[in-house]
Amino acid sequence: MGVENDGEPPFSQHAQLKKATEGTESLYTILMSHNPTHWRREVLPKTDIDLMLAGHTHAMQVTLFGRSLSEFLYPEWKGLYTEGTQVLYVNIGIGYVGMPFRFGAWPEITVLTLKNSVQ
């Protein structure tokens, strides 16, 4: 399922998470939400969504030795994060914001393979 952008101000907060999750209680749920701050602020405390996919950070288009200034704004800025049974994946994307420039934060396309643990 997907929701409208829901980020920290000045970004909009228009996600209708409750409406989006209606009727999904017994299903494995995957949420697409643009901003990773939505996970800690709304998804973790209010839902049992299994996997959230986010982007937004672009790793601020620069990483050095695996670190980025985006860490200061986004606790979850790149990669896989787990909290209990809930998982967040943040993709740093392929584009840019502002200047058409990337250094170390090379464009990323992610392929996730989901497997049923019950065989």
Please identify what each model-predicted range represents:
Residues 1-119:
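Soluble catalytic domains of enzymes that build or remodel membrane lipids, polysaccharides, and related
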